[in-house]
Amino acid sequence: MASAQRHSTPDLVRQRDPAGVSGLSLGLTSSEFAGLHEGAVPDVTYRELFFPHADPPRRLQNWARSRGVRLRTLTRIGRDQGGRSEKMLFGLHDGYAVESVLIRRFDGHTACISSQVGCAFACRFCASGQAGLMRNLEAGEIVEQVVRLGPKVNRIVFMGIGEPLNNYQQVLKAIRILRDRQGMNFPTTGITLSTIGIPKALKQLREEHLAINLTISLHATTQEVRDRLIPGARKHPLGEVVERACAWARRHNRPVTFAYLVLPGINDSIADARRLAAMLRDSPARVNLMRWNPVDGVGLQRTPDRSLAHFRTTLENALVPVVVRDTQGRDISAACGQLWLRDLKGLPVGNRPRQGRMT
């Protein structure tokens, strides 16, 4: 990593109640909240659980303190030079801490949130899976990241630590809680779920009544190259991933975005661009081209501007909608692929990335 922050966070402690207040409140829909046994939660309305965002309601804080339960907190561990991006450390009851990112825009804020404690898919270009998968985040833990990132959040991207579709039930429950009209009433059109593409889960997602945005981390045009870049996805055929994603797009009448990380000498040839164009021809799809965000110890390189331009032009000539995506927060290791699983002191968990250049 460009800079591994190591901050003491004494207020992030192990909770006496593992579920914590999130398990009793932020992890519930309004109907579930209304059905709680009388006295289980203080005299707080469902909406008050989410507003104001920055701090939990005082009555909820006092109630939690009287029972020896600490509310999870979000601690800032980095801010980029322009002040547009902030990296946060979200402490968990079991001693782990996942990273979230707040991105400021002129028309609101974007919350980049995590869905798992670690990741099982070991993407070659990403720091988040270096320690493997420890556990899934609960719906309340997912929702609480958004709540603590502040009232100006109007876009949510599941692009932090973890594979959202590998935690399907809790992620979908979190989205429903965020959408609940009696709570945050968050528009689903402001929610983007980014996934490597698990065909079975994509088929299930197709039947959900959720008008979210879907991004598929594709990154290759052949199974061989994708298996090298995303070892955990070897059992998911590339063609089936694309087919399921496009079926979702047709079902919901909205385009699916395919993210493509352009890596020199690996997947950046004109032949790759032509294969990608052929793969997506006449599909309700668009492409986001991305540059690699450096991670310490990973033998990859950022693609030169000229190669990226040639790749983009090839797609445009084939009439495939394409943009080059700009990434915020790279100078504080808060960009895509740079988030680490940490402990409560802010130290990275698990092994560092493998040394050496990918061949």
Curated annotation (Swiss-Prot):
Cysteines engaged in disulfide bonds, as pairs: C112-C336
Q: Where does [4Fe-4S] cluster bind?
A: C119, C123, C126
Domain Radical SAM core residues, every copy = 105-330
Q: Please state the Enzyme Commission number of this protein.
A: 2.1.1.-
Q: How far does the signal peptide extend, from start to end residue?
A: none
A single GO BP term for this record reads: tRNA methylation
Q: How is the cofactor bound?
A: Binds 1 [4Fe-4S] cluster. The cluster is coordinated with 3 cysteines and an exchangeable S-adenosyl-L-methionine.
Question: What superkingdom heads the lineage?
Answer: Bacteria
Cofactor(s), names only, from the UniProt record? [4Fe-4S] cluster
The cross-references to Pfam families, in alphabetical order and at most eight, read:
Radical_SAM
| Active site annotation, chain numbering | E99 (proton acceptor), C336 (s-methylcysteine intermediate)
Q: Where in the cell is it found?
A: Cytoplasm
Q: Which InterPro entries match?
A: Aldolase_TIM, Elp3/MiaA/NifB-like_rSAM, Methyltransferase_A, rRNA_lsu_MTrfase_RlmN/Cfr, rSAM
Which residues are listed for S-adenosyl-L-methionine binding in this entry?
Answer: G162, E163, S194, S217, L218, H219, N293
Primary location recorded for the protein, binned into one broad class: cytoplasm
Q: Which UniProt keywords apply?
A: 4Fe-4S, Cytoplasm, Disulfide bond, Iron, Iron-sulfur, Metal-binding, Methyltransferase, S-adenosyl-L-methionine, Transferase
Q: Which GO terms describe its molecular function?
A: 4 iron, 4 sulfur cluster binding; metal ion binding; RNA methyltransferase activity
**Protein family:** Belongs to the radical SAM superfamily. RlmN family.
What name does this protein carry?
Probable RNA methyltransferase RPD_2859
